[in-house]
Amino acid sequence: MRIWDCHCHCRGNETGDDVLRWMDEAGLERITLFSLYPPTLSAKREPGDTYGLDPFDASGRLGGPSLAYRREDVRAAAEHVAKVQAVDPKRIYGMLWAEPRAPGIVEEIERAIVDMGLRGVKMIPDHWSAGDEMMFPIYEKIQELGKPMHFHSGILYGFGDSSRFCRPALFEPLMHFPRLRFALAHISWPWVDECIAVYGRFGAAVHGTGRENQMWIDTCRGTPDAWRVEALAKAVPFCGMEHVMFGVDTVPSSLPKSAPVHARKDKDILEGMMGLTEAQVETFFWGANARFHGEKV
């Protein structure tokens, strides 16, 4: 069975050959690999801050709007993940982790996708909301380019007090950009029911139009094991297999340890507890992500 991890983070020091080796050890055919968060290239970080979620600003506060948002950092982050992707672009799908407050961000997103071949954009709402007007030119450009967006949603263990900006209902304004495919990560835990309801809202918006729901759900953990069965048992029947994707949420070097465990646990839930067919399980591990990226399945 092919497995595509829809949620993996660069650390910034990996090579494409490193990533492919770790993928092989983990049994992964393909990964979606997010670039570094650009401000971490010029801001201090905690030693244990693996993903760059808590860069310090000048006042010592974690995250937030007073960090330095530099265009050159966005470009450097894009260049690194593009270099990793270039080793095998059929297996490594790079996405730019974009900071919307960086100068020239719309142009840098276009450059990353058109000139560098990246597959889309990743964002975490950090003291901004998905419905803020500053986001609209970004949505328009990504919609024009036909690429997807991947958002963090749910509790946020970083960026200061930003969880309130990550509630799934805050993403409803994306329905004004109907050709923009987007995913909410972590099933928005602990707001799983709200996430699924938002998926239903986007479904209602396209009912009778012949258009596909523009929202996908990334099921990478955020849901601890105690909530995992309930979350999948709710999301899969309501949303359908084609819009519910498998993800791990780690850095490439940790894939050999983490990915097989997460895949086995989810497969046990889907097959053993929910009684899904082999074809349905394959859609979860591969086909849903392929559809998200606009590929024929």
Describe the function of each predicted region.
Residues 1-10, 82-95, 201-202, 207-218:
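Mobile, glycine- and charge-enriched loop segments
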Residues 1-6, 17-30, 34, 110-111, ...:
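Mid-to-C-terminal alpha-helical segments outside catalytic/metal-binding sites
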Residues 7, 23, 31, 81, ...:
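Divalent metal-coordination and catalytic microenvironments
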Residues 13-22, 101-112, 231:
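Short, acidic/polar
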Residues 49-164, 211, 221:
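Active-site gating/metal-coordination segments in enzymes
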Residues 118-120, 127-128, 132-246:
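Catalytic pocket-lining loop regions of alpha/beta-barrel enzymes
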